Amino acid sequence: ASDMGVELELVPTDWKSIVAGITADKYDISTSASLSPKRALVSGYTNSYFKLATVPLTLKKNLDQFQSWDDINQSNVVVAVTLGTTQEMQAKTYFPDAQIKAIESPARDFQEVLAGRADAHITSNVEAATLVETYPELAIVPVEEPKSPTPLAWLIDQDDQVWINYINHWIELKKAQGFFDGLMNKWNLKSL
């Protein structure tokens, strides 16, 4: 906003209606969103500026039970997801034999794990690093490798080419100036 000389206005939303907010012109740009062909049918995306992947989390005390993706894909395992997220779709694919428990925002999937109402949940490697630091009772399951490497971008109006061009040029300029690298260092993040 400061680069454009405008005032930032934050508009509350949730994941299940983030695309609808763009298409209904409730806001001009979203927070980071993983690229999704389904979303791209109705909303525009900026160029990507970061890549992440999906990892599972559980309670540290349950790590002896969960060492792989297959360990989680069991009929007696409950996997919590936040309704409307990419992880909700991924969980249904990764864990067809597990019980998928979709949580309505503002509640969060990891809270179900902390409360003992779910055995695991999946999230980005970025959020996982923050969660295990914030909640020491959580742990990242030491899977062979993360799944679904995914670029992040911002959702925008697909019919506004001037806005799309402006944001894409801004992203390119900020990449060249090290802005995104600085953010990654500040928040101890690693892009894939």
What are these regions (language model features)?
Residues T86-K101, I140-V143, I171-L192:
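Ligand-binding clefts/hinges and TM-proximal coupling segments of bilobed small-molecule sensing domains
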